[in-house]
A protein has these predicted regions:
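Alpha-helical structural signal
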Residues: 5, 9, 27-28, 56, ...
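Short, basic/aromatic recognition patches
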Residues: 2-22
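Zn2+-dependent cytidine deaminase-like catalytic core
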Residues: 39-136
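Thiol/selenol-based redox catalytic cores and closely related redox-interacting motifs
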Residues: 137-146
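Short, basic and Ser/Thr-rich N-terminal targeting/leader segments
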Residues: 23-27, 69
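Generic helix-packing signal
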Residues: 16, 20-23, 33, 45, ...
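Short beta-strand scaffold segments in enzyme catalytic cores
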Residues: 27-35
Length: 146
């Protein structure tokens, strides 16, 4: 029996599945304030012709505010250095992610951005939520392209 996941991670996973169907790497994100999703996005690098169009970046932009200190970000994959930097600059309160990313991740892998003394903001960190489903989406997507 699988463990139920948060409805916010469930939404991020639905966005990731839609991204895969559109030919994008399956990553989705949802930004939550006061128990409600206020912004969401999936990877759209191919669709937008923009290498910075990661789900996290697009979600932060969609929120339309410089500071998001009262918000939590749910994302299906451990954020990369670019996205972790944006999360720090936006001062997001809590970061929840699904699958770890041993190659490109920057939270618990690689530069471990939020553990650096020069990082000006460190959100509360919660990894591994919905990790199995997130990892399966990524494996299936990339296996079909190799």
């Amino acid at each position: 029996m699988s463990t139920p996941i948060s409805p916010f991670m469930a939404r991020a996973l639905a966005l990731a599945r839609a991204a895969a169907e559109a030919g994008e790497a399956p990553v989705g994100a949802a930004l939550v304030r006061d128990g409600a999703i206020i912004a969401e996005a999936a990877n759209a690098m191919r669709a937008l012709g923009d290498p910075t169009a990661h789900a996290e970046i697009l979600t932060i932009r969609a929120a339309g505010r410089e500071r998001l200190e009262d918000c939590d970000l749910w994302v299906t994959l451990e954020p990369c250095a670019m996205c972790a930097g944006a999360i720090a600059h936006a001062r997001i309160r809590r970061l929840y992610w699904g699958a770890p990313d041993s190659k490109g991740g920057a939270v618990e892998h690689g530069p471990r951005l939020f553990h650096q003394p020069t990082t000006h903001h460190r959100p509360e960190l919660y990894g591994g939520i919905g990790a199995d489903e997130s990892a399966a989406l990524l494996r299936t997507f990339f296996a079909a392209r190799r």
